[in-house]
Curated annotation (Swiss-Prot):
This is 26S proteasome regulatory subunit rpn8. SMART domains: JAB_MPN (SM00232). GO terms for cellular component: cytosol; mitotic spindle midzone; nuclear envelope; nucleus; proteasome complex; proteasome regulatory particle, lid subcomplex. InterPro entries: EIF3F/CSN6-like_C (IPR024969), JAMM/MPN+_dom (IPR000555), MPN (IPR037518), MPN_RPN7_8 (IPR033858). One of its GO terms (molecular function) is metallopeptidase activity. GO terms for biological process: proteasome-mediated ubiquitin-dependent protein catabolic process. Keywords: Proteasome. It comes from the Eukaryota. The gene is rpn8. CDD domains: MPN_RPN7_8 (cd08062). It comes from Schizosaccharomyces pombe (strain 972 / ATCC 24843) (Fission yeast).
Amino acid sequence: MPPAVSSETSTIVPQQVIVHPLVLLSAVDSYNRSAKGTKRRVVGILLGQNNGDVVNVANSYAIPFEEDEKNASVWFLDHNFMESMNEMFKKINANEKLVGWYHTGPQLRPSDLEINNLLKKYIPNPVLVIIDVKPKSVGLPTNAYFAIDEIEDDGSKSSRTFVHLPSSIEAEEAEEIGVEHLLRDTRDASVGTLATRVTQQAQSLQGLGQRLTEIADYLRKVVDGQLPINHAILAELQSVFNLLPNIFSGPVVSEQALESEAQRAFNVNSNDQLMSIYISSIVRAVIALHDLLDSLAASKAMEQQDIKPTVQNGEVSANAEQKA
């Protein structure tokens, strides 16, 4: 399906908007800090990449925004703050460009078109993403929109309106790990059960198995000549393989021999680790016993010499008393 084009400006309308979890977390955090418990909404800027068909929203930041609840046409947006933030984000990551703006809605407002027109001075084709910070049903908390000029059939003056765009939540592997840790830390510990923990471990192992399968398929296609050799990817894989323990030192003879050798190497490694822990415990016990014997000897010597112990700077010292 070819991408849609707005009539007056000949602007390509994006076909999909991808929102990363970091954007959702930033919007919720800004809402909880400044607008929680009120009817106010939070407005912010979206950063990422726009290749025409797909808008990838990877980062965001909130901006000062005020509006009159009774009169929707009265609002204030601090564009000076936005300009200063843009300069700082350029220094952090030059690949993240201004792609649009967001607010916490949860629906379109009458002033959204005016705000969108203002932001066009800084963003050529801004995308609006409404983030529902308090969703009442299960589903995506985002709705994406794009402003176009709609021409009437009777030839009258065109009107500007928002069209809905498909949106999705996608994350890179590092973001997935971060979100999993965040959910694990915020989840009520009393609710967790053994079945829940086992399920989480099974899902993690399933994800790891899927990644390993993808790597094996890629290497197989490279060997068969279906894909070109990418030395950067091979270098990354080699660095991963170098972290694995060197289990086999001799020639490989059979699968059964491999299993027995792997089991033996694993047992030896486990025994070495347990031995290190055991020796460390013995050393700590000997040191503690040595300190105890020193303390007893010093105390006995003080009693025999009628020396009164004093403590200075955490150290025991003795001052002898003169006998009459």
